[in-house]
Amino acid sequence: MTKQRYEEKNERIRSAFLALKREQPERLRERLNLSWSNWGFGMESLETSAKRLQRSGIGYIELHGNHYGPDLGYRAKETIDILEAHGIKTSGVCGMFSADNDLSSSRAPHRQAAIDYLKREIEFTAEMGGSYLLVVPGAVGRPKAYDDMEFQRSVDTLSIVADRFVAYGVKAAIEPIRAAEVSLVRTIADAKAYIAAVDHPGVQHINADVYHMQAEEAHIGEALLEAGERLVNLHMADSNRGALGDGFMDLDTIIMALYVLGFNREGRFVTPEPLGPGGDPYPAMYGKPDAAKLDDLVARTAAYFREREAFLVG
């Protein structure tokens, strides 16, 4: 019986991984850096979130980019104190882009809001020692395009703050998102084209998300390899956008592709973000947290990821 095409692609990645394991075992010594995106925890305290991550052996956190105004959001010193008390470092910040701060908006006040928001988050990311700030080129939850110029408006608006990424030493990580949620930049290829259009050293990286990739990419593993050195963070959830191990996501092939890519190094992160299904996940950030459910979600996800990684790496 011949293999299906996706199986052939899986096998190519497996063969490359096994060759790496056999010929360059030193490249597998370091494990992947496991982080967690905390905005899906809803309206719980950062202290509670940090304790949960510590219990599950997660050493990094992707902080909710919640500086929606000058007086809103985390304060750096307080946040650092809480995280340090639980042995957690900041991997990066998850930028949140709605219709109110849409880089591609046809309304100038909304683009200005995006500029002001990015200025605040770039500074905060740097204060926290974060490596990257996630940037979405268009509003999440708006799958219908404004017009034919929205891509260029987004590029032009992000370009206004591009110098700040360089000045603060923060990577702008462009996230492709599935067509059910956004009107532009849905694939790794789209993200690379967007980066090329911005054409700035401060905007050179990609934040991929396997949940979106299963809808938009021909093969997740191949797309990760296509992202190459631009890939700085990978959001994870299973096929049902739940805990890892609860669906049919091919986690082994993803892990092998990341090792082939050399992703197991400083400044590169694997970040679970299981939010549940739906066309607009942002309401999760305002939800009332169920601590027991979240404890279980994090514990099972972290344990399953490390179990599969240990099995593959040996």
Show where each model-derived region lies:
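Basic, amphipathic N-terminal segments that precede the first structured/catalytic domain
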Residues: 50-70
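Histidine-acidic metal/acid-base catalytic patches
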Residues: 1-35, 43-57, 185, 189-205, ...
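Alpha-helix-loop-beta-strand connector modules within alpha/beta enzyme cores
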Residues: 79-97, 153-168, 192-198, 256-260
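Generic structural signal for hydrophobic
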Residues: 53, 83, 121, 125, ...
